Amino acid sequence: MKVRRDPLDDLFSFYIRTRAGWKCERCGRMPDRRGLHCHHFERRRKKSVRWDEDNGVSLCFGCHQYLDENRDEEKAFMIRKLGQQGVDMLKARTRAYGMPDRVLITIYLKQKIKELENDN
């Protein structure tokens, strides 16, 4: 079952890739913008962490494909990125009840993007 994308997904993806400096966080490549993806450690259907910044990482197409197909490698990458405690905390947040506040998330992401753009 494919999860439908919406404007908040696009904003989240833009933030994650901007935060990474428009580079792949696994191999360091800088593909064009269409070749750089926002990968979710915990899949997008888990609404409680769908737009959680710890759940997103910027990957080139090749690394995205590789981690999607190699879950053990994805887990190892996730631990290197977040640390074991960060991974455990993210997993705990997947079990949160209720719907995320989409308006608040939108405001937060726009502010974070603005801060990143002002730093450059």
Residue ranges and their predicted role:
Residues L8-H37, C60:
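Short cysteine-rich loop/turn motifs with clustered Cys
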Residues K81:
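Conserved catalytic core of Hanks-type protein kinase domains
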Residues E25-V57, L67, E73:
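Histidine-centered nuclease catalytic patch
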Residues V3, P7, T18, Q65:
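A short glycine-/small-residue-rich loop at the edge of a beta-strand within enzyme catalytic domains
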Residues M1-S13, G28-D32, Q85-N120:
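A boundary/linker detector
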Residues Y66-E73, Q84-L90:
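Substrate-binding/catalytic groove segments of enzymes
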Residues G62-L67, R95-A96:
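Short histidine/acidic/glycine/proline-rich micro-motifs that form metal-
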